[in-house]
């Protein structure tokens, strides 16, 4: 477990000693970088996010040929993206998304159950309903497209 602020070189060094990356960050620059580390080092990435009354969780697993990566879903739009520190977040959403991330992480580490790879869980906190979206790799993804074309 890493519980301190890390710059990019420190993140790269730390990634050599982990089995799963759990992304609980609040900015896209860090999320994109964690995604690159995940892909380069073949480490599963458990991604969770919450803003206002909405949350989402998925697993990107570069060890699986049909797994998309974070960049397959999200473009790099620079500083245009909202953060929960700017837009606010309904506090219970953090516990629900974080708990789901913890469950996915434990499943990966224990090699039990079916991880959320290729599926995005979306939580609507106002109606308290979950929905699931199937995810596929983007053939034009700048991070992982080459790995999908050669398999």
Residue ranges and their predicted role:
Residues 2-11:
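Conserved SAM/SAH-binding loop
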Residues 10-151:
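Glycine-rich phosphate/adenylate-binding loop
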């Amino acid at each position: 477990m890493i519980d301190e602020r890390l710059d990019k070189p420190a993140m790269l060094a730390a990634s050599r000693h982990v089995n799963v990356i759990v992304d609980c960050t609040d900015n896209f620059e860090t999320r994109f970088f964690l995604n690159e580390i995940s892909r380069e080092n073949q480490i599963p990435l458990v991604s969770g996010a919450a803003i206002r009354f909405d949350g989402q969780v998925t697993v990107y697993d570069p060890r699986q040929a049909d797994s998309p990566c974070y960049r397959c879903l999200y473009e790099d739009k620079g500083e245009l993206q909202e953060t929960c520190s700017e837009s606010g977040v309904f506090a219970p959403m953090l516990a629900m998304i974080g708990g789901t991330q913890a469950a996915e992480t434990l499943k990966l580490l224990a090699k039990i159950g079916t991880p959320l790879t290729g599926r995005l869980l979306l939580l609507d906190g106002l109606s308290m309903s979950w929905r699931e979206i199937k995810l596929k790799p983007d053939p034009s993804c700048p991070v992982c497209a080459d790995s999908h074309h050669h398999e």
